Swiss-Prot record:
GO biological process: protein insertion into membrane; protein transport
Keywords assigned: Cell inner membrane, Cell membrane, Chaperone, Membrane, Protein transport, Transmembrane, Transmembrane helix, Transport
Region (Disordered): 43-69
Main localization of the protein described in the UniProt heading: membrane
Organism: Wolinella succinogenes (strain ATCC 29543 / DSM 1740 / CCUG 13145 / JCM 31913 / LMG 7466 / NCTC 11488 / FDC 602W) (Vibrio succinogenes)
An MF annotation (GO) of this entry: membrane insertase activity
Tree of life domain: Bacteria
Protein name: Membrane protein insertase YidC
Amino acid sequence: MLDNFDKLNLQMRILIATAISLLFFIPYSYFFAPVKEAPLKESTSMERAEQQAAPQTSSSPKEGQVSSVAMAETSPSKDIIATVQGSHFRLEIDSLGRIAQVYLKDAKFLKEQKELPLLAPLSSLRPLEVRFSDATTNKEAFAKSYYSDRDLVEIRNTPETLTLTQELEGFKLTKKLTFYPDGNYDLEVETSGSQKRFFLSPGARPIAESDKFAFNGVVLKESGGTIHTTEDGDAKKDEIFEGARFVASVDRYYTTLFFVKEPQGLRVVISKNAEKNPEPFVEALDHLKLSGYIGAKDFRLLESIYPSLTDVVEYGFITFFAKPLFLLLDWLYKFCGNWGWAIVLLTLVVRIILFPLTYKGMVSMQKLKDIAPKMKEIQEKYKGDPQKLQVHMMELYKKHGANPMGGCLPLLLQMPIFFAIYRVLYNAIELKGADWILWINDLSVMDPYFILPILMGASMFLQQHLTPTTFTDPMQEKVFKFLPLIFTFFFVTFPSGLVLYWFVSNVFSIAQQLFINKTLEAKKRAAAAKPSGLSD
């Protein structure tokens, strides 16, 4: 069996490796993804007060030890002291001066005609939660309620301000919030009457769209532009960052974050909780001014709030390539007005860019097909002498101008493009609720009738029959024939937008193959019709 596998050409090995990679990737992501944060058990009011602890930090960045911080367990549904109403969102603030819940009101976010709640249940770290470095002050802060200057804030076309105040022993804590129509806000926190070091959190990540295939955790942009990520279940140590541009808790589609536009940035502490999930805090003494946002990771919206926030949309190691692809997709959407057709146009652009390489690869494959019988003869003749086999094979390639590597380059180039497009389409909130045609009414979810995956598999099968092959043993041919079935199985649960890309890519490849086959056939006929004695 090993001898047979050694005979596989390089293109075949790449195809098999791709299939095996997908076969490994999906089960691994499902069964071995980091365990998501679980709610802690209900505790008494006294226990909760004693558990609240501020991160303990040193003065040097990234070298301080940060203690594990117990999460607040006060129910966000109780003691709501203020409600903020916007055309796109509704926000509730509890008696501890925290954002208890955020509901998205746009049609594509509604679930069973109900507003979509973003934040985790009662045990999670809440946005705007304040903790103090002094344990006594911290305990008091979680026992005393804030009061608000307004019960209801309605935002229409202009910003609205809300002030929250907490009276503590020897000083007063004030939070002044200015809310904007898109869900972003400005925040000023101040302690008056005594100098106090405090820690303010943007909150734990939203839980509206937790997904094992997507990044869930904390994203931070350092002063130099470096993006730092800590995934849920993977917080190995407590860290401190000086001069951060933003810190965001994110799930697949949503985020709660803090940011500043000033060059000095933020001093951010990322603490590790008992489940090894990251918990972000901004550290300050007496006074802190920053801005925040809670809502969807919509690229255009984030860009309009502050361009640097587009880096909150995280594509992993392939971000450098995926982000330009999304910008191209977004431009195509502006051109055609439909995300499905934008994906079709993106696929066409990719196929056109790759066409010169594809053409060379297909010509090379055709040449290899033409000399396949001679290749088999040489393999049979020199099967006991690998050195002579290699020498004679190279002579055969050289004589006929064939390149065994020629058919592999287009495939190799397509794989990073595919994985980049996979990340783009999988993480794009813009595709949520976006329809295409007929039965495809949401490009962010799987095809409910499996029509697109079946069409994709059928197109791959047809493409196989049109593509020249150089099989020299039966095992190679059998593996190749099963690839459409394997890929169809993989793509059944993939978002419709991603399956649409692969299907349309196959259709364009078939059209290219038919064109190239026709061109090569015409050249063969012309060469055959040329008188043998005629010279140029």
